Amino acid sequence: MYQPPFKLNSEILSLATEISSLIERFVIRLEQADKLKLRKANKIKSIHSSLAIEGNTLSENVVSDIINGKRVLAPQREILEVKNALATYELYPKLNPFSIRDLLKAHGVMMHGITLDAGRFRSCNEGVFNGKKCIHLAPPPGRVPALMADLFEWLKKSKEHLLIRSCIFHYEFEFIHPFSDGNGRMGRLWQSLILGKWNPAFEHLPVENMVYANQQKYYDAIAKSSVAGECSPFIEFMLQNILDTLKQFKDIPVEEGTALANDIKLSLRQKKIIDMINDGDVTIAMIAKKLKVSERTIDREMSKLQDLDVIAREGSDKTGRWIVK
């Protein structure tokens, strides 16, 4: 089996450990965030950032207007890039990050009407450019199908942590540069998909936004890895970006005073109880039936949540209702 060249140093392992710790805190906070609003906001940021890296000049506000179906005055190609990116991100839940067929399908949507060979591997020579400077010359087109098959086989079978695999895949993808256009945006999308297999919370994390804010370091990491002949510099760069993204979003706005806002750790059952209270008026009997436990068990859990100042009872015992504070 093909083995991409990389070295796991202490910095990489330290970053991976810190990310693993922070992602769990992020998931807990996410439970009480407005996921629909967060998903939409991050989708806009992700699309704007990923396209801006590739030279799209539209502002985040204009990208938002296009996504919301408003008419805008802008170059047609740039508008099409936004619409295509949106259509591709809508496929996110259905795409298998371990499937070459799905990669080609996603590229076909992403580059529809932009390049004639959308959805197909390139038949011409390509390279990675930082402005007008070529920082990496990609392998000949005839080698692309075999190289991609090897890369996907490694991705599926490797025992490395998915967090690290996602970074290695991203670099190897850019090294191969399998398409005539759209390699950057596809590489970033595919890393997000791989990360999503490790933890679905990554659907809510606009990693592309952090890369956009550090474009020069992004290209520097690719160049350093190419010179070194192994991708440790790129792995470190991407892990640092993921960590920075998690730190940036660790304070997701939630209603002030909730357990999540105060870093109180809740059990899975307690989180389910909170979700049910948020969904509408419920009684202890209804919660017990839904969770398939005794009413006495739920009564104890509710008392704990009241003691933690997470929930409260509004009104009388007979006519009142439970609320999340």
What is the role of each PLM region?
Residues 1-325:
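FIC/Doc superfamily catalytic core
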